[in-house]
Amino acid sequence: MQTVCASLCGYARIPTEEPSYEEVRVNTHPQGAALLRLQEALTAVNGLLPAPLTLEDVVASADNTRRLVRAQALARTYAACSRNIECLKQHHFTEDNPGLNAVVRSHMENSKRLADMCLAAITHLYLSVGAVDVTTDDIVDQTLRMTAESEVVMSDVVLLEKTLGVVAKPQASFDVSHNHELSIAKGENVGLKTSPIKSEATQLSEIKPPLIEVSDNNTSNLTKKTYPTETLQPVLTPKQTQDVQRTTPAIKKSHVMLV
């Protein structure tokens, strides 16, 4: 009776169908020109990384995609610096234009430091993929602003070298090779300078005999004179030597009395 009254009054519960859930598949991979640009960026960056990145790693988040674009700009700068270094290495250092030699050395050193800094920034980006690191973004922004200028400010390079831990090595090899090439061009001997070798007879002739002090008793004041030992050693026969040893007392080596 209660059910009939409830149905007449509109209080009856009409059974509804259970809700069904359908998986919505969204294609996360870009299509067309965007896909080609991402593949080009991956090709440029993966050549400088210890392990290559995949397209899934890049499109997983917007931050990773943004970092890939920045890494591509750094990779292009690195390639340009490497090409400049290869061209500058073909320069022959001569004395005709010393000012040009200094400019070439300066450009080679700056290009090498800029290339190392770009590579360090790319590696820093690679290590920060999947992590939220504001410091990395700041470093790369500063790097991109610096490399976008027509003239590179080396003070910014020094700051980034200290931040990324890149040590600038002195370019001493250019001066050594420069001096070596000039010496060869002049026909000079570039070997080590050694003193001439003296013969045994020459060495013996240069040996100075020792000097001894001799006291003179003939004068009122005792004076000491220095004579070489060669002048006090006359050549005696064996018989004369035996006579001197019997009649003359032992004479000290340090003093000889002259009569």
From Swiss-Prot:
Enumerate the subcellular locations listed in this protein's record, separating them with semicolons. Virion; Virion tegument; Host cytoplasm; Host Golgi apparatus
Note the lipidated residues of kind S-palmitoyl cysteine: C9
Family in the record: Belongs to the herpesviridae UL51 family.
- Alphabetical keyword list: Host cytoplasm, Host Golgi apparatus, Lipoprotein, Palmitate, Phosphoprotein, Virion, Virion tegument
- Known function: Plays several roles during the time course of infection, including egress of virus particles from the perinuclear space and secondary envelopment of cytoplasmic capsids that bud into specific trans-Golgi network (TGN)-derived membranes. Localizes its binding partner ORF53 to the host trans-Golgi network (TGN).
- What is the annotated quaternary arrangement, including any partners? Oligomerizes. Interacts with ORF53; this interaction mediates ORF53 localization to the host trans-Golgi network (TGN) and subsequent incorporation to virions.
Q: Pfam family of this protein, just one?
A: Herpes_UL51
Q: Does the keyword Phosphoprotein apply?
A: yes
Q: Please report the PTM annotation for this entry.
A: Phosphorylated.
Cellular component terms (Gene Ontology): host cell Golgi apparatus; viral tegument
Q: List the disulfide bonds.
A: none
Q: Return the protein name.
A: Tegument protein UL51 homolog
The organism of origin for this protein: Varicella-zoster virus (strain Oka vaccine) (HHV-3)
Q: Which InterPro entries does the entry link to? A: Herpes_UL51
Is DNA repair one of the keywords UniProt gives this record? no
Which superkingdom is the protein from? Viruses
